[in-house]
């Protein structure tokens, strides 16, 4: 029987033995955890410790070179190796399609995320309760930055993570944009059915340092530039056609798919706005009230403005290369 956690230490450096030492015996929750990783030895004890009550845990590894596999096995997790073949499917969709889950419900979390102790009972009630029309649940994430929870910037941040695995898949955005690597980073889960919201909230330690923030967003800006170039080389779609697509999507204004679609269309339109970096800073600092988070909120907003600057600069660089290559072909 899997051990449940209780009051666990929150220090990511705690060993599996230390985390299990504070665990108490209890009935496992009939849910499958899916955690994609690569070189997450430092984060895994905290993340896996927070879901030690789950009956089944899959860790899908993209060839870690640290001790991630050993740490995962110490928590009785099943470690599955994944190697991306071309562009699709990426890691999470591959896992949803190929892993033999013991349970109907699956919860997807990253190694830098942590569930609170009260999540155990809420998950138990959902997966063991009376059947209803809800097939997926969104969870709110609390971003940690510079050692504090950002209570305004990037909050609330709802993400669909708990769902019936046969009825949910990550969306496929574009074939050509693979800058985000082998894992679904910008994609969202689309489920066939109604959704609800969890009461518990999940802590997200995505940026343990500014260095990590810069490294991640340097990669993400590569992805954004590739997506922008994909649209650029395909020709100008035009605002009228975007409006037509939006009108079709809005036939079901309450669906999660539509809400994400509208947000994504607005993001597409915002690409053409002047002063994007400054506008992104204002969005996080003023609209999302990041200024109420004090100095960490200010730096968080400034860094997101810098991220937009990288997206703009890299896109312009790729366009220059594309035009230069086209000119050389014409002259040849």
Residue ranges and their predicted role:
Residues 81-88:
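Short, acidic/glycine-rich phosphate-metal binding loop used to engage nucleotide
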Residues 45, 66-75, 118:
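Acidic helix N-cap motif at the loop->helix transition within catalytic regions
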Residues 74, 93-105:
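Active-site nucleotide-sugar/metal-binding loop of Leloir-type enzymes
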Residues 6, 89-90, 96, 116-322, ...:
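Catalytic-site signature of metal-activated, phosphate-bearing donor transferases
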Residues 50, 61-71, 84, 110:
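A conserved acidic beta->alpha catalytic loop
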Residues 16, 35-56:
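Short, well-formed alpha-helical segments that are part of the catalytic scaffolds
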